[in-house]
A protein has these predicted regions:
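Amphipathic alpha-helical interaction surfaces in cytosolic regulatory modules
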Residues: 56, 61-64, 68-111
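Generic structural hydrophobic/aromatic packing signal, biased to beta-strands
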Residues: 31, 52, 94-96
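STAS-typified acidic loop motif
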Residues: 2-48
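Short low-complexity stretches enriched in small and charged residues
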Residues: 17-24, 49-56, 120-128
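A cross-taxonomic marker for long C-terminal extensions/tails that follow the last structured domain
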Residues: 104-148
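A short, well-ordered alpha-helical element
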Residues: 40-62
Length: 148
């Protein structure tokens, strides 16, 4: 298989990303994923966290919008890195937008929905048509509604 060069490697054999937008003033980022998310064999969450997310966290990013419509499969393991990531965002949040239902089911099987908001109103099909700030405001309002 060949991956279009516009996708960036995170150090995983099967999972690639595009950082679509980051606003360091507001403290949010939009990251799109493609491929197979494999925590069981490759520990992709550790690779993602160490190589990408920790850098963003140090720069003040605390709200993560993860676009998952191109995730082909998910193989879970434990939730340690997800819990760690959740704890580190403090006043922020993690939102999984447009993840396929079967991937959400696998996330829930490993209790990752305790750390990442997903499903329901976060299935935003028209996210590509929204300006990044409008997209952030929409997701943020949906998260705030869930937390209230």
């Amino acid at each position: 298989y060949f991956i279009d060069p516009s996708w960036d490697s995170i150090g995983s054999e099967t999972l690639y990303i595009k950082i679509l937008y980051t606003d360091y003033t507001i403290g949010f980022t939009v990251i799109e994923f493609i491929g197979e998310w494999n925590d069981a064999i490759n520990n992709d969450i550790m690779t993602l966290k160490r190589n990408i997310l920790e850098i963003m966290l140090k720069e003040g990013v605390s709200k993560f919008i993860l676009i998952g419509e191109n995730i082909l499969n998910f193989h879970g393991s434990d939730d340690c890195y997800y819990e760690e990531w959740f704890d580190e965002v403090e006043d922020g949040w993690l939102a999984a937008v447009s993840f396929p239902d079967f991937v959400q089911d696998e996330f829930k099987k490993y209790h990752l929905d305790s750390y990442i908001n997903m499903g329901g109103t976060l299935q935003i099909d028209n996210w590509r048509t929204l300006h990044p700030l409008n997209f952030y405001e929409l997701v943020s309002s949906l998260i705030q509604r869930r937390l209230s």
